[in-house]
Amino acid sequence: MLLNKKNSPIILIGFMGTGKSTIGEYLSLEKQLSFIDLDVYIEIKENKTIPEIFEEVGEIGFRKIEYNYLTECTKKYDVIATGGGVIEYTESLNYLKQYKYIFWLDCDIDVIFKRVTNDKHRPNAIDKSKKQLNNLYLSRISRYNEIAFMKVNSDKTIREIYNEIINYLTCG
């Protein structure tokens, strides 16, 4: 199964640290699809890190920038790993609703906390307790659920997650 530009891209959503970038890259390599990590794309285009952008324009300013690049990437790439907060901006949330293959990667907050603690590239995780991260996570669940084609537990191996996604794409 190879996607072409006429097909809907595979879009990975979910909280920070759930494996969107890792799974997106693996999926693209296995299926010879084009892939982009939206945060990396933003950093390249803006010539700044995500934390620098947050510092300069705040979260709302960042979400507007993110939306502009999201609309660009959905037209250019087969597989897109979004930032965890892409659903926080109403325009991005509504834009994503038009796409069919949105996979919500999710895992236990303890796993997430271990993965993101002290990660300086995640401005919403810096100096946050597990309780604070959990509150942010809980505030986003309904939006992830609203647009997800399928929820995938990412507490598994990369290959198991990949197989589950491919199964949904080919059989579901």
Swiss-Prot record:
Pathway: Metabolic intermediate biosynthesis; chorismate biosynthesis; chorismate from D-erythrose 4-phosphate and phosphoenolpyruvate: step 5/7. The keyword Cell membrane does not apply. Its cofactor is Mg(2+). It is an enzyme of class 2 (transferase). Its main location: cytoplasm. Its EC number is 2.7.1.71. InterPro entries: P-loop_NTPase, Shikimate/glucono_kinase, Shikimate_kinase/TSH1, Shikimate_kinase_CS. Binds 1 Mg(2+) ion per subunit. Belongs to the shikimate kinase family. Monomer. This is Shikimate kinase. It comes from Staphylococcus haemolyticus (strain JCSC1435). The gene is aroK.
